[in-house]
């Protein structure tokens, strides 16, 4: 038996229930993993609230979470990439990471290097790999650019601050409070804009001598859309990598009127395939961590049983950096 969080209807954090679940033996191509830490990501909130539809069969509901680290307890027939005793992490497993033990496809597992603890790795899998694909694939940064990054003090944001600094990129980051601004700056964000008291477009124009930026990474969505577009240089790129304030709907004529802008809504799934490529991404991330260029530790830790409270904290915007669960 394993303790796991399940939910049977969409709604607030109160729909999350801690239950006992049966965990069987892994089948062909599968592995059983005992979790040491589980990561919270805002996409978990989207699934819980129904913004991202998820099947909730009557009577069985669904697990939650796709990002965790742990140790391989057993492997099924045909599994060669991992073995019993391996420390592993994953970021795009089937829903169900909010659990003590689970069975999942072995192909999603990423071996962890000895120099990175499970606790650190739990903050890196989804969030660090997100920074990798945004900065190295969606809009490959070469160094020397000045960029705008929204929510710079969040879980992905603090890693992005450090990655930008390592690349020689000047990051302008938006934050909601002065305290979060200090945290972002301490992690390598060159300029912070405190949105509760500063005008985003005005400050970006001041910082860039009126030029604007070539790319905006916007995980907020509805509330920052127009500001993001107005901060871009002609032919600039708007990367919509999240919609925490609401979905974004953009008329193509608006992109033309704002300067022949480009827009993309990337999804992690399309940037981590095939498996060999995912492992290369992870190696680049781990190399930065092992070299000390990226430092990542959880800023908030909750017991698995307190997953609902962890969701409340995440949604309240009171947290900075990464939040993890301990099973």
Segments (PLM) and residue ranges:
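Glycine-rich beta-strand-centered segment in the early N-terminal region that forms part
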Residues: 22-40, 51-95
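NAD(P)H dinucleotide-binding glycine-rich loop of Rossmann-like/cofactor-binding domains
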Residues: 57, 66, 74, 88-153, ...
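NAD(P)H cofactor-binding loop motif with strongest signal on the N-terminal glycine-rich segment
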Residues: 151-152, 220, 243
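Hydrophobic/small residue at the entry helix of a nucleotide-binding pocket
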Residues: 156
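Adenosine-nucleotide cofactor-binding segment
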Residues: 165-227, 274-277
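Glycine-rich phosphate-binding loop and adjacent beta-alpha segment
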Residues: 167, 175, 223-293, 327
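C-terminal hydrophobic helical "lid"/dimerization subdomain
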Residues: 275-327
